[in-house]
């Protein structure tokens, strides 16, 4: 993947980070596995998968205003503060810059690796129109729409990030793997419900997240960081009890 793809996505990265702290990525954009190469093209208009895409979109749009729609809106915010709030009860431990600084930075780093670098080449190449644009509807987060219109729909970066994050946190806290896998799946599906992505975008994003997970396993800096994350999330002082957080048994 060429470095110019980073320029294309840099405004998105900056907009999502609310902390001024800089986190060094585990690899460069050029060292990402090229998603344009390994992903098939998104479904064409005459493809049965495209009919399924439309069915899934309208199924999500039909529950607009419901609790699940509101969850999709919450999932759309990939700021580190919001992701920590979502995944802390699922992993069963605190996630904040004071008690778990390595985990906090890992959340940021995985967004860059999975949400942006890993998806960039396919997004740039296909520049697929998003469903809310095609149908002239609002998404669950209208404030994101101007940015999304300029960003290819296929594959879903949010989904790649959520999948990657669930897998990495499962490495650190394997006893919470089933809960993390479920929440990671829902995080991706939220993009269809929100109206920001087609189902095939999300399906592809899940695979991109898995590919990036495999890529990270080969990088010593990631392994070193993961060891610290594992230590933080299993520190008895950072573990959540049922009394601390009623959602622990999610």
Swiss-Prot record:
CDD domains: PAP2_acid_phosphatase (cd03397)
This enzyme's EC code(s): 3.1.3.2
Keywords: Hydrolase, Periplasm, Signal
Enzyme class: hydrolase
Catalysed reactions, semicolon-separated: a phosphate monoester + H2O = an alcohol + phosphate
Gene Ontology MF, one: acid phosphatase activity
InterPro entries, sorted: Acid_Pase_classA_bac, Acid_Pase_classA_bac_CS, P_Acid_Pase_2/haloperoxi_sf, P_Acid_Pase_2/haloperoxidase
Domain of life the protein comes from: Bacteria
A Pfam family recorded for this sequence: PAP2
Subcellular location field: Periplasm
Family matches, as SMART domains: acidPPc
GO CC terms, sorted: outer membrane-bounded periplasmic space
Family indicated by similarity: Belongs to the class A bacterial acid phosphatase family.
Description of how the protein assembles with itself and partners: Homodimer.
Protein name: Non-specific acid phosphatase
Species of the source: Salmonella typhimurium (strain LT2 / SGSC1412 / ATCC 700720)
């Amino acid at each position: 993947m060429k470095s110019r793809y980073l320029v294309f996505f840099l405004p998105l990265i900056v907009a999502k980070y609310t902390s001024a702290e800089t986190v060094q990525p585990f690899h460069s954009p050029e060292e990402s596995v090229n998603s344009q190469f390994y992903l098939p093209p998104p479904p064409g208009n005459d493809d049965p998968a495209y009919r399924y895409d439309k069915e899934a979109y309208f199924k999500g749009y039909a529950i607009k205003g419901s609790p699940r729609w509101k969850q999709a809106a919450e999932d759309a915010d990939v700021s580190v503060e919001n992701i920590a709030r979502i995944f802390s009860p699922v992993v069963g431990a605190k996630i904040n810059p004071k008690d778990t600084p390595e985990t906090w930075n890992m959340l940021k780093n995985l967004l860059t690796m999975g949400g942006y670098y890993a998806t960039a080449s396919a997004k740039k190449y296909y520049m697929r129109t998003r469903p809310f644009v095609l149908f002239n509807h609002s998404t669950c987060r209208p404030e994101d729409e101007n940015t999304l219109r300029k960003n290819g729909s296929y594959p879903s970066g949010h989904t790649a990030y959520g999948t990657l994050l669930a897998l990495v946190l499962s490495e650190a806290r394997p006893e919470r793997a089933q809960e993390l896998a479920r929440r990671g799946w829902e995080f991706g599906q939220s993009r269809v419900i929100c109206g920001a992505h087609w189902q095939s975008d999300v399906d592809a994003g899940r695979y991109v997240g898995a590919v990036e997970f495999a890529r990270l396993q080969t990088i010593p800096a990631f392994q070193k960081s993961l060891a610290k994350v594992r230590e933080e999330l299993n520190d008895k002082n950072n573990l959540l009890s049922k009394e601390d957080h009623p959602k622990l048994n999610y």
